[in-house]
Amino acid sequence: DGNSGFGLATSYTDIKPIIKPFSNGLQDLIIGEDPFCPEKLYEKIFKLTDTRISNEKGWSKEALIRISAALDIACWDLIGKASKIPLYKLFGGYRNKIPVYVTCAYYRDGKDEKELKEELKKLINIGHQSFKVKVGGLSIKEDAKRLEIIRDEIGAEKELMIDVNRGWDLKTAIEGVKEFERFNPTWIEEPVRWEDDRRSLKVLSKKTQIPLSGGESEITIFGCRSMIEEEAIQILQFDCTMFGGFTNGKKLSALCELNHLDI
């Protein structure tokens, strides 16, 4: 009928395995489905992750998780366009503004203090008020020096968030949060390594007043639910393009509200 929806998925690995299912049959399971029933389509594709057909055709679990998320987002985009109602209103219309931050201060070989300061000045000049910066690739002492520069440049009033990208073991994380408390960060994101992150996050949260965030690297809503239930984090950061789409994003939002967690 001429309606279309746009969806996307995020992947940090080779995208060829994610494209593959569309070349050997997955499209036949999608064509003809009702886009106004996004949860039904999502479940249909997601449940293929544990089936004989996916094994026989070489559809990886990651591919199906990403595809189901992208399809769900596309369905919701189509629903919004067809109804001529923006999704924020379809989802309840609780707010019409959202806070934003800029992710910056990435590591790069040869990047010196002068370049870091210039980067921050440019971001401030175009109006940014909240800054998320990267740590975890250097020693605590070296990262603390970078954070001193960053805090001095942005000032005491602007928000500073710290993203470790799962770069620390628990011992280093405990040292890091103690050292970084003086920078008054809004949160520290994914501070510990992946293999025992929920247990480590719970231990770490008892060692600091800085809110801990996580969830971005989970691959299902159930992993996020476990983080909430185990009281491992104070802020849930899930990525609808990594898994779940908007359908499961709404579920996680409700779960956070019921458990008094921020998103």
Model-identified regions with their sequence ranges:
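Catalytic core of soluble alpha/beta enzymes
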Residues: 133, 138-263
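Catalytic domains of carbohydrate-active enzymes, especially glycoside hydrolases
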Residues: 119-134
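Metal- or metallocofactor-binding catalytic centers and their adjacent structured scaffolds
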Residues: 3-82
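N-terminal small/glycine-rich loop or linker at the start of catalytic domains
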Residues: 88-108, 146, 153-157
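Tryptophan-centric aromatic hotspots in well-structured domains and transmembrane helices
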Residues: 76, 101-103, 107, 128, ...
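Conserved active-site and cofactor/substrate-binding residues in soluble primary-metabolism enzymes
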Residues: 17, 21, 36, 40, ...
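Active-site mouth loops of central-metabolism enzymes
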Residues: 97-115, 135-136, 164-170, 213
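Short, charged beta->alpha transition segments
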Residues: 86-90, 115-122
